[in-house]
Amino acid sequence: MEAGRVRAFFMDECHLLWGDACGYIWGPTHQRVEVPIENSRRRQTYYGAVDIYSGQFYLRPYERANGHYTVTFLRYLQRLYPDQQLVIFWDGATYHRYGERIDFLQQVNQGLAKHQWKVTCILLAPHAPQENPVEDVWLKAKTFVPQHFHVATSFKKVKQLFVRAIESEPYFDCPKLDQYMISCT
């Protein structure tokens, strides 16, 4: 990898559910309070990546998490940084290890020496979501949504709240990022 020409990201996906908007409501004792809820099975999948060096967060909505959308998100990151090599740290989801992702890496890295690869993917420790700073971003957004449940009258508004929580702070100073930084001194 050439110095100054590498971007490193932690990447993950998140499923936002209509039920994530649930909060608490006060009502008279021994009286049932009814709150209208539309389809409780509604969901939106988001892919996100945090730049290890700047803390900038990139968010994109997709229909679901699978190999196709994983590759679509990787291509999105490539378009943002066309002249840089990308290093992606992520969990061991099946669609991160097989199928379309493998085909994509073979295509973009074809004929290149390993140190010249355009995209390098590194798996985090298995069953250790606490290692991925993107999980902290998801938690922040999923905490924000029920804190504002009074305006979450539709799933569209739930999604808007989720995105607003992330976009209100597009640069994340996750303490976990520091443990992955390499000292240049």
What is each of the regions a protein language model found here?
Residues 1-185:
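Short functional hotspots at interaction and active-site rims
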